[in-house]
Regions:
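Long, solvent-exposed, polar/charged low-complexity segments
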Residues: 151-176
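A conserved mid-domain beta-alpha-beta active-site/ligand-binding segment of alpha/beta enzyme cores
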Residues: 4-35
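Residues that form generic nucleotide/phosphate-binding pockets
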Residues: 18-21, 52, 56, 127, ...
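Polyanion-binding interface signature
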Residues: 25-150
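Extended aliphatic helical segments
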Residues: 4-6, 12, 49-50, 90, ...
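Catalytic cores of nucleic-acid endonucleases
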Residues: 1
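Short linear sequence motifs
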Residues: 11, 20, 39-40, 72, ...
Length: 176
């Protein structure tokens, strides 16, 4: 039995080295900048954008909105907020997994449209087929569309522009 153990020792050592290399490659070491208060502020921006978009949509007198029974939800890889807008339930996500997906746009913000029963009905799904695949993310049994933030813009400009993107999506989804 000991000769078998000795025969596999190089394989085990090679596998152990490979696993250590994977661990090393997957973890990006912290820099002093990563641990600064400024980095914490940068990370907070994504949550603030989602919250502000919900506020802007709620304040729009052209939309019938409600947050009744809905709450903000943070999770390990992101943050989500929902809002009833007219006949739809709109869910806005900041999600790092969606952001990192190599098959879709590199985008931190995504939106899903459902009915008030929280279903992506056939008419909604038909409208979503109009978008190219790289503009769609499939997550939580829903199809999400990107909300592309402006670069080098103020907080207000970013949020207003995303609200306008949502308005265009709503218009398209409503079309008969």
């Amino acid at each position: 039995a000991s000769s078998v153990d000795v025969a596999f020792t190089p394989d085990v050592l090679q596998l152990e080295g490979y696993c250590n290399q994977l661990d090393s490659d997957a973890f990006i070491p912290f820099s002093s900048e990563d641990l600064s208060a400024e980095m914490a502020k940068k990370g907070e921006r994504y949550y603030q954008v989602v919250d502000e978009i919900i506020e802007l949509l709620s304040a729009d007198n052209n939309l019938e909105t409600s947050r009744k029974g809905l709450k903000a939800t943070g999770y390990r890889k992101g943050y989500t907020r929902s809002l009833y807008i007219d006949e739809f339930t709109v869910t806005i996500n900041y999600d790092r997994d969606m952001w990192k997906n190599p098959k879709t746009l590199e985008c931190p913000f995504w939106i899903a449209f459902r009915d008030h029963e929280w279903q992506q009905t056939e008419p909604i799904c038909e409208k979503l087929k109009l978008f190219p695949e790289y503009h769609k993310e499939y997550f939580w049994n829903m199809t999400f569309l990107p909300l592309i933030p402006l670069q080098n813009a103020t907080f207000s400009e970013v949020c207003e522009d995303i609200k306008e993107q949502i308005s265009k999506y709503l218009q398209l989804i409503r079309e008969k």
